[in-house]
Amino acid sequence: MEPDIKISAIFPVSAKKLYDSWLNSKSHSDFTGSKAHIESRNGSHFSAWNGYITGTNLILQPYGRIVQNWRTTEFPEGAPDSKLEVLFEKHNGGTKLTIIHTHLPNGDEKKYEKGWKEFYFKPMKLYFQKSKPASKAK
């Protein structure tokens, strides 16, 4: 089955930093600009964007992969959770982060793809660019 959404972006930080930031309430809140509560524990519940997003951590493979049940307050009543897979891959001194999002409500794929780009990738690029160590002068 093809994923509903599969998008990637490159960040100028290690997979460890990106992974740890995704699973830390303060960092997740800081890089999205909105309140999040998340733990790096299998089976733990999380919320992001002031409760708009909720779910459960299903699989946590340190610095490589996160799998979550994921939903928003806009999912139709009775709709099952979607599945989110976040992959972290070393890439030219940084990390390629890939979002694979499946089982979204029919017709909502473009809306959520736009959301990932605007409300995650865009602010994350700014956040991690600021946290990148300055280059040393020669």
Features from the language model and the residues they span:
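Alpha-helical scaffold segments that form or flank carboxylate-/histidine-based iron centers
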Residues: 13-14, 45-49, 111
